[in-house]
Swiss-Prot record:
Lineage of the organism: Bacteria, Pseudomonadati, Thermodesulfobacteriota, Desulfovibrionia, Desulfovibrionales
Family named by the database record: Belongs to the universal ribosomal protein uS13 family.
UniProt entry keywords in alphabetical sequence: Ribonucleoprotein, Ribosomal protein, RNA-binding, rRNA-binding, tRNA-binding
Protein task: Located at the top of the head of the 30S subunit, it contacts several helices of the 16S rRNA. In the 70S ribosome it contacts the 23S rRNA (bridge B1a) and protein L5 of the 50S subunit (bridge B1b), connecting the 2 subunits; these bridges are implicated in subunit movement. Contacts the tRNAs in the A and P-sites.
Keyword RNA-binding on entry: yes
Descriptive protein name: Small ribosomal subunit protein uS13
Species the sequence originates in: Solidesulfovibrio magneticus (strain ATCC 700980 / DSM 13731 / RS-1)
Length: 123
């Protein structure tokens, strides 16, 4: 089992699929990485040689932000928006959608579960 960017690649998966287990790498990026390193994308991840693994690792470190670095950059970007007090930052702070979706009836994912209406007390 190859370990790249702190992630154990799954066994018996094609390399283009196995690389997508790394945060920040999708299918297109995985194919681009494999093409630049000269690794066959149909090859299984458990059939990689140590040289191929090292080439992929070097390519990732040199040209791509993945895993922790990417997560930190995303978090820092959201924090910056909240600090400068722009509209998107306020929406993030309040836990509401910030891309213009309606919130009257939808956006339950961002708002969380519904708060029920309290039953009126009988007098």
């Amino acid at each position: 089992m190859a370990r790249i960017a702190g992630v154990d690649l799954p066994k018996n998966k094609r390399m283009d699929i196995a690389l997508t287990y790394i945060f920040g790498i999708g299918r297109t990026t995985a194919l681009r990485i494999l093409e630049s390193t000269g690794v066959d994308w149909t090859k299984n991840s458990d059939a990689l040689t140590s040289e191929e693994t090292n080439n992929i690792r070097k390519e990732l470190e040199a040209n791509y932000k993945v895993e922790g670095d990417l997560r930190r950059e995303i978090t820092a970007g959201i924090k910056r928006l909240m600090d400068i007090g722009c509209y998107r930052g306020l929406r993030h702070r309040r836990g509401l959608p910030c891309r213009g979706q309606r919130t009257h009836t939808n956006s339950r994912t961002r708002k969380g579960p519904r708060r029920g209406v309290m039953a009126k007390k009988k007098k």
